[in-house]
Every structure is written in structure tokens, then in C-alpha cells.
């Protein structure tokens, strides 16, 4: 039994360490074993003020080969146009008509009731914005100051379903651009229409670029866990491709460079933004580093030649909001993949589907976690029973095993032969309890990532003192229950004959319990319920086996 338990603990511990380290490296963070350069928070990336953010011509995407470069107009006074809908508070910078600030009014910051998550921002300490412009000539781009058309109400009132804000560029290269943002009630999808008017005397063939620009400042995540932060690309050909900031640093990023479908995104824990061009429109995809700590991902969509006096419309959608899986599935193919489960996606997605169905019946995510854990334990009960039966049989013969070890302690070969004979006589497999446990590990790891990645847990209460399942227990009641359950579970298992192993078995619950003090309450709730059910199962099976043995032959 001591061999089996040792193997299990070693497998579990090493798996946890390697998973954590691989997750670190996979998401651009330093490895515990292979040190690498780390990202630093950006300095003022262009800055922002009441007159709008400033940018330079050098940050305009490269145009197609042979195209004339765009120039920057003389400095002009820009403004920040504030707007408000039922889901957003934001600011549009008239320099470029750039979406420079976006606060999610239905997503609290988890700490103060009157503060909300700000997704887009452009300050001295943080840059994250969405912008567009034209390439292919000396055409308007995101450095030019636009003029708001038809200034008026910039708030979505009670009787409105949509809010439109339009901005007109100066004429450059014989071209004028009118950019219109359309906000819809209850929606995190923003319509972005780019109308290109040829007011010159010669045909023009511009290219529209749409990009997301972000620094590499890390977002807050639960301690001992990291989720992906950076650009992502989706196409029908290559599907979902994450791009590490570290690969952009080295100019080694590998992703699909052209398509007529899909989207580009910036992904972080719980939230994402994505440009979604029209399906069927050919576009080039790019992702690059543009400053010491500033990156961008975007698309360049060519426009057919526009004759003098004619115009062309390029329509796209911009998603900016929480990674709610069902909502994302209805917006664009593959967009739900920004909710990143990593390599356990194939198991995690069905688990979340089931968790969501249970929530639909009980209306509380905490109780949904409890019921899902109960359901999983019920499904795996036959495997757990086999494991506990094996453990019980090993516990029965432990005194005889210890006697054999003492008897042959000077001759390891004879000791091993005697132990194998004992196993054969008693029809006990020392590793019989391992396989059932190993089979269950991927499911429980997947459920861990489901609870960690699901924005639905943010602000979701359970009972009494648990007001947010995505935050740690404020009174540490669940972590204490977790520690107690681990000690009880350990005490039900046979004590290893080796004193060193026995001490290790006592130390491991302490080590893991300390970690759980910093985990989100939803995760700890899952592990507490799982442990309590495991204890009940083990106690029931052990009593049942004991009752059978007491019956007369």
C-alpha cells in the first residue's frame, strides 16, 4: 500500500508542478526551470489627456508593397467624446475616431461596489484600444483628427434600442472617411461602418485596417494560477491560434496570415475584444510589437477601386466584453474559444455545458457547483469503489507486510519475493487502486479550469458570507473545511510503514491547504464537496466490506 500511495502522490505532485510550469511558459511567463526574460509594465505609451491621446505616424500598419506611405497631418486639437449605453461607459478620441476607453457597466471589479471593469483605456500606465484607418496612399488614418457629426445626445435613452455616433475625417489624398459606431441595447457587439468617399479627381484603391492595440501589463488572476494574455487569431483553416507576446518580441509568431473569414482578438482572463470583418471579405492578418511594451493584432482589408464622386462602405463588428460562452457562440464561429481551457478543452466544454444546465434549474452557481460535483462522483462511483476496495484489502494485510519487511530487511530481494507471494496468495494488486484514480484525474483538472476560466463566477453569490465565487473566501471558512477534510481523508488511508513516507503523507495536506487559502471560493467549494463525498464513499465501502467479513462462513 505504501508503494501505491507513494506513486500516487509523486504522480499528483509532479503533474501539478509540470502543469503549472507548462502553463507559465505557454502564456509568456517565466519558467521555474528555464528562466527567460520577463515582461515589464509599460511607461506612458502615447499618453492621454483631456484633449485626446497622441500617436505617431510610425505606428500605422505597413501598406502593401508599392503603395504610397501615409503621412501625418499637422497637430490638431482632439477631444474625447463620452458616451453611455446600458452596458458601456466609454470615450471616443476624435484623433482617429479611436475607441479609447470602454467600461463594462455590468461587470464590477469585485472589490468595490461602485467600480467596474475598464477594458479599453489609454493612460500613462495602461494602453488598450481599438482603432481603424486607411492604407494605400496619403489617406486618413488613426493619427488624423476627426470631427463629430451631428453632435447631440451621446447616451442610450430608455426609448432607444441603438445609439449611433459618427465622425468625419479631414480630406487627405482626395479621400474623406466617415466612421460610424452603432451601439445596441444589451449587446457587447459594436457595429463599425467605414464609409470612404472619393472627393478627388482620380480613382483610389485604399485598404482598411482594423486593429487592437494593447500593452503587456498582466491582469489580476487568482494566486497560483495564470491564464492566457495576448493576441489570438481564428480562421477556418487553422482555427484558434494564440500568439504569445514573447514570440512577438522575437518576431517568431506563427499564425495564419490571410483569410476571407474569422477574426482577430486580444484575450485576457474573463474578458476579450475582437474585430470581426464581414464573412467572405479577403483580408491580411498581422500581429506585431510596435513599442517596447506595446503590441497589436489586426486585419487589412482591401477595397475595390473607387471612382471619383463614388463611395464604398466597409462594415465590421467589434466585440468587447465578458467571455460568456453561449453569448460568444452566437456572435461568430469559434469566438467562444477565447475562453481558454488549454489542453483540457475537449473535456472542459461538456463540463461547463452541464454546469450551465444545472444552473438553469437551481439559479445559483454555488449550488450548481455542488450538484455537478455530486453528479461526477456518482458517475465515477464504480471506479472509486474499486479503488477503495483495493485500499481496504491492502490495509488488512499491512501488518503482515510490515512483518515481512522486518524479517527480510537485510535481504531486499527476498523481501520483495515474499511480498509478491503475499499479494498472490491474498489476491491483492498493490497498484489496484491507482488506475481508477488516474482515470478520474483529467476530469477533475478540467473542472478546475472550468471554474477558473468562467466569467459567470464573477460576482456570483452562494450562501451567507460567499458573495463572489471568483474571489477568495473572505473569512477562510471554506479553506479551513478543505484542510479538515484532507486530514480526515488521509487518516482513513493505511499508514505507510516507512516513517519518511508517513511524514510526507501528513505534510502534503498542509501544503495543499495553504494553497487553497488563496484560491477563488468556487474552486475551494468544489474541492470541499469532492473531499466530503470521497470520505463518505470510502467510509461506506469500508463498512460494507467489514460487514461482509463478519458474516459466518
UniProtKB/Swiss-Prot annotation:
It is a multi-pass membrane protein. Gene3D superfamilies: 2.70.98.90. Disulfide bonds: none annotated. Keywords: Cell inner membrane, Cell membrane, Chaperone, Membrane, Protein transport, Transmembrane, Transmembrane helix, Transport. The chain crosses the membrane at residues 7-24, 365-385, 435-455, 474-494, 509-529. The keyword Thylakoid does not apply. GO terms for molecular function: membrane insertase activity. Pfam families: 60KD_IMP, YidC_periplas. It comes from the Bacteria. CDD domains: 5TM_YidC_Alb3, EcYidC-like_peri. Required for the insertion and/or proper folding and/or complex formation of integral membrane proteins into the membrane. Involved in integration of membrane proteins that insert both dependently and independently of the Sec translocase complex, as well as at least some lipoproteins. Aids folding of multispanning membrane proteins. Interacts with the Sec translocase complex via SecD. Specifically interacts with transmembrane segments of nascent integral membrane proteins during membrane integration. This is Membrane protein insertase YidC. The lineage of its organism: Bacteria, Pseudomonadati, Pseudomonadota, Betaproteobacteria, Burkholderiales.
Amino acid at each position: 500500500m505504501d508503494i501505491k500511495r507513494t506513486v500516487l502522490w509523486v504522480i499528483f505532485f509532479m503533474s501539478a508542478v509540470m502543469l503549472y510550469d507548462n502553463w507559465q511558459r505557454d502564456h509568456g511567463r517565466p519558467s521555474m526551470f528555464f528562466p527567460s526574460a520577463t515582461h515589464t509594465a509599460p511607461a506612458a505609451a502615447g499618453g492621454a489627456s483631456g484633449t485626446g491621446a497622441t500617436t505617431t505616424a510610425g505606428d500605422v500598419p505597413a501598406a502593401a508593397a508599392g503603395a504610397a506611405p501615409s503621412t501625418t497631418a499637422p497637430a490638431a486639437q482632439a477631444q474625447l467624446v463620452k458616451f453611455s449605453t446600458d452596458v458601456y461607459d466609454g470615450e471616443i478620441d476624435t484623433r482617429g475616431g479611436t475607441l479609447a476607453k470602454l467600461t463594462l457597466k455590468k461587470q464590477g471589479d469585485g472589490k468595490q461596489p461602485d467600480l467596474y471593469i475598464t477594458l479599453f483605456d489609454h493612460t500613462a500606465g495602461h494602453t488598450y484600444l481599438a482603432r481603424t484607418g486607411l492604407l494605400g496612399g496619403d489617406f486618413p488614418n488613426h493619427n488624423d483628427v476627426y470631427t463629430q457629426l451631428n453632435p447631440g445626445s451621446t447616451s442610450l435613452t430608455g426609448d432607444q434600442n441603438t445609439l449611433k455616433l459618427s465622425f468625419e475625417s479631414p480630406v487627405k489624398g482626395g479621400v474623406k472617411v466617415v466612421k460610424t459606431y452603432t451601439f445596441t441595447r444589451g449587446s457587447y457587439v459594436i457595429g463599425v461602418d467605414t464609409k470612404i468617399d472619393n472627393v478627388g479627381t482620380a480613382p483610389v484603391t485604399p485598404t482598411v485596417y482594423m486593429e487592437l492595440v494593447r500593452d503587456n501589463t498582466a491582469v489580476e488572476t487568482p494566486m497560483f494560477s495564470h491564464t492566457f494574455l495576448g493576441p489570438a487569431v481564428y480562421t477556418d483553416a487553422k482555427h484558434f491560434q494564440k500568439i504569445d507576446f514573447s514570440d512577438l518580441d522575437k518576431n517568431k509568431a506563427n499564425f495564419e496570415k490571410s483569410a476571407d473569414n474569422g477574426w482577430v482578438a486580444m484575450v485576457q482572463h474573463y474578458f476579450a475584444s475582437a474585430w470581426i470583418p464581414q464573412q467572405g471579405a479577403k483580408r491580411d492578418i498581422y500581429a506585431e510589437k510596435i513599442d517596447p511594451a506595446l503590441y497589436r493584432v489586426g486585419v487589412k482589408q482591401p477595397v475595390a477601386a473607387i471612382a471619383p464622386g463614388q463611395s464604398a462602405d466597409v462594415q465590421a463588428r467589434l466585440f468587447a466584453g465578458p467571455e460568456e460562452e453561449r453569448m460568444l457562440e452566437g456572435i461568430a464561429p469559434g469566438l467562444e474559444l477565447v475562453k481558454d481551457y488549454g489542453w483540457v478543452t475537449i473535456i472542459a466544454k461538456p463540463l461547463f455545458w452541464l454546469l450551465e444546465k444545472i444552473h438553469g434549474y437551481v439559479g445559483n452557481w454555488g449550488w450548481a457547483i455542488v450538484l455537478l460535483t455530486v453528479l461526477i462522483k456518482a458517475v465515477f462511483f464504480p471506479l472509486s469503489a474499486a479503488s477503495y476496495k483495493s485500499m481496504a484489502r491492502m490495509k488488512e494485510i499491512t501488518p503482515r507486510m510490515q512483518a515481512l519487511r522486518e524479517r527480510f530487511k537485510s535481504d531486499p530481494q527476498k523481501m520483495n519475493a515474499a511480498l509478491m507471494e503475499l499479494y498472490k496468495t491474498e489476491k491483492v494488486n498493490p497498484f489496484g487502486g491507482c488506475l481508477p484514480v488516474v482515470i478520474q484525474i483529467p476530469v477533475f483538472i478540467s473542472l478546475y479550469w472550468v471554474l477558473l476560466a468562467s466569467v459567470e463566477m464573477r460576482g456570483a453569490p452562494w450562501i451567507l458570507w460567499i458573495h463572489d465565487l471568483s474571489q477568495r473566501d473572505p473569512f477562510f471558512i471554506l479553506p479551513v473545511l478543505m484542510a479538515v477534510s484532507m486530514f480526515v481523508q488521509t487518516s482513513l488511508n493505511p499508514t505507510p510503514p516507512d516513517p519518511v513516507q508517513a511524514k510526507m503523507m501528513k505534510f502534503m495536506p498542509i501544503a495543499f491547504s495553504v494553497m487553497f487559502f488563496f484560491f477563488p471560493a468556487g474552486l475551494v467549494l468544489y474541492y470541499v464537496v469532492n473531499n466530503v463525498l470521497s470520505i463518505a464513499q470510502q467510509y461506506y465501502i469500508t463498512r460494507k466490506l467489514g460487514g461482509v467479513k463478519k458474516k459466518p462462513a
